[in-house]
Each structure stands twice: as structure tokens, then as C-alpha cells.
């Protein structure tokens, strides 16, 4: 399950125009827990359902265009990116457990997308809307402390030697502080 969620986060980063995942979004669900084939009709139906169109009055293509919805996304409920660590934390942990080199490549793409779009003259700032395709990225005057304390720590650790804060010897609390596991 953790692998699927992490791979889903990576996919979501790649699916967005800026290469950065939004804070809150809804996807079209597969009918079962098994992988499913792409179903454009199901996507359109879910987009309209999320928009509240029970009577069929809305044009689905117009909604998709106006809402800037990539395929599979039924809604982007919070388009901000506030420099959160959870996605890269998941990539880091899965990488340390599996050793999958593709996870480092994905982490590098995530890092570059974040740096390219959030960098300011002094630091990094949250983004108001990650769905913009017109180059009008709004970097807000906001940098939560978890950017430095957690997000950048996980980006650093995924490219460090695996014995640096090894998951065999340490666990992380919710604030990304490593604690030695008693032996």
C-alpha cells in the first residue's frame, strides 16, 4: 500500500504543469483496488459530479479547461503548494527500504521543480496556484518552518549514503527528527 501511495504522489507531481503536487485534489477512482484502464467517460462523469452538475447543464470540456484539470483529476480543491514534506518523505522512506534508483531520479525532478518555481531572492516561498500553465506563478511571502526542518532534510537524505541516519538504527517523528531505536 505504501508503495502505491508513494508512486501516486510521484505521478501527481509529474502530472501537474509546474511538476508540483497541489495541497488538496480528487482523482477518478478505479472501481476496484486493482489497477484499471483509463476511462475518459468515467473521468468526465466525476468532473461533473464534483462540480455539482446533476442535471447535465455543464459542458465537461469547458469545466476541464476552466479548472485546468489534467487527465484523471476530478478537482483541484486547494491549488497551493506550501512547501510540505510528506511526498518527499514518502519517497525517501520507500527509497531507503527498497533501494529503487528511480526514486532518486523522481526526487531530483521534484526538487528541481520546487526550486525553479518557489525560489525567491532570499529563500523559498509557497505557491498560490500550481495549475498555472501561462508562466504566471505567484510565489507568496510565506515559508513554513517545515520547509527547512523537514522538506529539505528529506531531500538531503535521499541523496546521502544509506548509513547516514539508517532506518535500521533510527526512526523519525512527525517533525522529521531522527531518534535512535533502542537495541
Task: Walk through the language-model features, giving the residues of each.
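Glycan-recognition and catalytic cores of secretory/periplasmic carbohydrate-active enzymes
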Residues: 1-183
Amino acid at each position: 500500500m505504501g508503495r502505491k501511495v508513494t508512486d501516486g504522489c510521484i505521478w501527481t507531481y509529474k502530472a501537474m504543469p509546474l511538476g508540483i503536487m497541489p495541497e488538496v485534489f480528487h482523482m477518478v477512482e478505479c472501481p476496484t483496488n486493482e489497477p484499471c484502464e483509463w476511462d475518459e467517460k468515467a473521468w468526465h462523469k466525476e468532473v461533473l459530479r464534483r462540480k455539482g452538475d446533476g442535471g447535465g447543464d455543464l459542458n465537461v470540456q469547458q469545466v476541464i479547461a476552466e479548472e485546468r484539470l489534467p487527465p484523471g483529476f476530478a478537482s483541484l480543491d486547494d491549488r497551493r503548494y506550501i512547501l510540505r514534506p510528506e511526498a518527499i518523505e514518502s519517497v525517501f522512506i520507500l527509497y531507503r527500504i527498497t533501494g529503487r534508483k528511480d526514486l532518486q531520479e523522481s526526487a531530483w525532478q521534484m526538487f528541481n521543480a520546487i526550486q525553479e518555481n518557489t525560489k525567491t531572492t532570499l529563500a523559498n516561498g509557497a505557491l498560490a496556484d500550481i495549475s498555472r500553465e501561462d508562466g504566471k506563478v505567484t510565489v507568496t511571502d510565506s515559508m513554513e518552518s517545515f520547509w527547512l526542518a523537514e522538506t529539505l532534510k528529506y531531500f538531503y537524505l535521499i541523496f546521502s549514503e544509506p548509513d547516514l541516519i539508517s532506518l535500521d538504527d533510527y526512526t523519525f517523528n512527525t517533525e522529521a527528527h531522527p531518534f535512535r531505536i533502542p537495541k
